[in-house]
Curated annotation (Swiss-Prot):
UniProt family annotation: Belongs to the peptidase M10B family.
One GO term describing the cellular component: extracellular space
Organism, as annotated: Serratia marcescens
Residues given in the record as Ca(2+) 7 binding sites: 386, 388, 390, 416
Protein name: Serralysin
Cofactor binding mode and count: Binds 7 Ca(2+) ions per subunit. Binds 1 zinc ion per subunit.
Binding site for Ca(2+) 6: 377, 379, 381, 399, 406
Reactions it catalyzes: Preferential cleavage of bonds with hydrophobic residues in P1'
Record: residues binding Ca(2+) 5: 368, 370, 372, 385, 387, 390
EC number: 3.4.24.40
Binding site for Ca(2+) 2: 304, 306, 343, 345
Length: 487
């Protein structure tokens, strides 16, 4: 999604990534840019923070009205409804959650507790609980309901003197509700309704069964299932593509919302965590074992040296390690994001032609097979292109400063390229970067120095016109000035 400070329309052409060098990196860095006065599809664009606040606009929490950022301990149960024939909404045919449903509901609860400072404890069916789960099958006695999906009540919902807060109800006539382990829309339904029970609203003022709302009725552009599983609207409205799959856990704006209500969970995944292939997360939605098994998630991670491993995918991918960014992973679009405040240090691409963008940390980026584009950004990064014709992009002296220089670990002379074109673009000159035999203090001078004994080439550049170079990249292998640079 190309972003400007004017109204834009989501089209296929505006979503097409550039294919080489700096343009590919710049396109990914601005992918799904939002807020700051932008309009998308004729709607105001909300930042991640704005969206989180809007989703919590009812200001209801289990700690009290407008009591924000405080941890909470909640109970939940699966009542058997042996002595109840009708629920508060008038639905009948009530029944207890099956073992399969209970397992999936617990996984949904766990996904909320992972990102927010919430503790859930199960209590027996007959005990009072903050959050309850139940099935219904008829909207009135003898009339089976095949039209609705589920509903829930926010904390502190009082109706006719009854506190309905935390009740969640599911239409067992829907096969995805009855068998949520095999149909991922059912799992999303559970997580969505628990979101309501915790205090989250839809991103817009709409409800199922109230008129015929569409995406045209949204309050802000990012009200889609790319940004929030509390939304009703397809991710395709904002240029995403989940390939017919649904998220199982809170997405980017849901995390902002729930952390506003209860604070962030500071103990989730504090070690060295791997997401995707070879995952050690213990979460099904953060893990994959085959090219056909897709992932849709927003990463919340509280520490450690972490890795996005998408090495088993064959499609071209675009992976961005910056917080609040989106990546195109495994043949989908905008299906992986990173929550605010999270640092993912490393990324491993697959066998397609991947674009991988690092952040300010010391990143290890591995392109794998295919013709890849790698950009470390700030920090002292290690870049591995892998097999194929790879491009290593740099855009600032701070990307690889002396004393904290990047390493290109597997440069292939005459095959790979180093892209310094942004320096020329910034200087508004086609020959700002020019190679010399020695430095004279002139800005733009570049020098290659090869050490045969170590097989390491130093690429030094004087960007600022100082007496000494202010940019240094260490390269394993030889580099040819005539063939191996884009300037």
């Amino acid at each position: 999604m190309q972003s400007t400070k004017k109204a834009i329309e989501i089209t296929e052409s505006s979503l097409a990534a550039a294919t080489t060098g700096y343009d590919a990196v710049d396109d990914l860095l601005h992918y799904h840019e939002r807020g700051n006065g932008i309009q998308i599809n004729g709607k105001d664009s909300f930042s991640n923070e704005q969206a989180g606040l809007f989703i919590t606009r009812e200001n209801q929490t289990w700690n009290g009205y407008k009591v924000f950022g405080q941890p909470v301990k909640l109970t939940f149960s699966f009542p058997d409804y042996k002595f109840s024939s009708t629920n508060v909404a008038g639905d009948t045919g009530l029944s207890k959650f099956s073992a399969e449903q209970q397992q999936q509901a617990k996984l949904s609860l766990q996904s909320w507790a992972d990102v927010a400072n919430i503790t859930f404890t199960e209590v027996a069916a007959g005990q009072k609980a903050n959050i309850t789960f139940g099935n219904y099958s008829q909207d009135r006695p003898g009339h089976y309901d095949y039209g609705t999906q589920a509903y829930a009540f926010l904390p502190n919902t009082i109706w006719q003197g009854q506190d309905l807060g935390g009740q969640t109800w599911y239409n067992v006539n829907q096969s995805n509700v009855k068998h949520p382990a095999t149909e991922d829309y059912g799992r999303q339904t559970f997580t969505h309704e628990i979101g309501h029970a915790l205090g989250l609203s839809h991103p817009g003022d709409y409800n199922a069964g109230e008129g015929n709302p569409t995406y045209n009725d949204v309050t802000y552009a990012e009200d889609t299932r790319q940004f929030s599983l509390m939304s009703y609207w397809s991710e395709t409205n904002t240029g995403g593509d989940n390939g017919g799959h649904y998220a199982a856990a809170p997405l980017l704006d849901d995390i902002a919302a729930i952390q506003h209500l209860y604070g962030a969970n500071p103990s989730t995944r504090t070690g060295d965590t791997v997401y995707g292939f070879n995952s050690n997360t213990g979460r099904d939605f953060l893990s994959t074992t085959s090219n056909s098994q897709k992932v849709i998630f927003a990463a919340w991670d509280a520490g450690g040296n972490d890795t996005f491993d998408f090495s088993g995918y064959t499609a071209n991918q675009r992976i961005n390690l910056n917080e609040k960014s989106f990546s195109d992973v495994g043949g989908l679009k905008g299906n992986v994001s990173i929550a605010a405040g999270v640092t993912i240090e490393n990324a491993i691409g697959g066998s397609g032609n991947d674009v991988i963008v690092g952040n300010a940390a010391n990143n290890v980026l591995k392109g794998g097979a295919g013709n890849d584009v790698l950009f470390g950004g700030g920090g002292a990064d290690e870049l591995w292109g892998g097999a194929g014709k790879d491009i290593f992009v740099f855009s600032a002296a701070s990307d690889s400063a002396p004393g904290a220089s990047d390493w290109i670990r597997d440069f292939q002379k005459g095959i790979d390229k180093i892209d310094l074109s942004f320096f020329n673009k910034e200087a508004n000159s086609s020959d700002f970067i020019h190679f010399v035999d020695h430095f004279s203090g002139t800005a733009g001078e570049a020098l290659l120095s090869y050490n045969a004994s170590s097989n390491v080439t130093d690429l030094s550049v004087n960007i600022g016109g100082h007496q000494a170079p202010d940019f240094l990249v260490k390269i394993v292998g030889q580099v040819d000035v005539a063939t191996d640079f884009i300037v």
